[in-house]
Amino acid sequence: EEMNYDKGKMVMHVGGATGGKEAGIERFINNFSTYPERIKNKVILENDDKTYTASETLKICKTLNIPMVLDIHHHNCNNNGENIFEMLDEIFNTWNKEPLPPKIHFSSPREGEFDRKHADYINGEEFVKFINSAKKINRDFDVMLECKEKDIALFKLVDDIKNNYNWIDETTFEV
């Protein structure tokens, strides 16, 4: 608000599960209803790596009519066997009333497939595999990279995958 940018969003996790996940979800929904409209309009939910899966977070987002940011790494660490690509269209549809495209977070595990810590860099092969599967939805979306080496990791990823795609600029490609 102080920046006079009305499209800004706040990414949140659902939070704790004291009393069980169903109680935590109910508590989140009840608390959300007390937020001022200007805050409600800025909130987007992200699935987490320990407690609330992508499918649980999606259900909350649909109930509250708010966008969901899908975190791929969190899904890999915390899921109930759901195929993320079967959910992706539904997740992206939570953004239908927004002026901005859907967002996803992508990171690679530091050590081992289920390590919750973020690696310094992005695994280019895994990134390409995800993008090639996601393109079947035929919808623009933004990818936010979460890696310890920040911009250096972005430039390394671009170098790793540059031959796979048509590049619009140094950080934007089309599939």
Predicted regions and their residues:
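A generic short-segment signal for beta-strand/edge and adjacent turn/coil regions
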Residues: 12-14, 25, 36-39, 73-75, ...
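Active-site-proximal loop/turn and secondary-structure-junction residues that shape catalytic pockets
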Residues: 14-18, 47-51, 72-76, 108-112, ...
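Active-site flanking residues adjacent to catalytic metal/cofactor-binding acidic residues
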Residues: 45, 70, 145
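Active-site acidic/histidine proton-transfer and metal-coordination neighborhood
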Residues: 1-63, 67
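Histidine-acidic metal/acid-base catalytic patches
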Residues: 66, 77-175
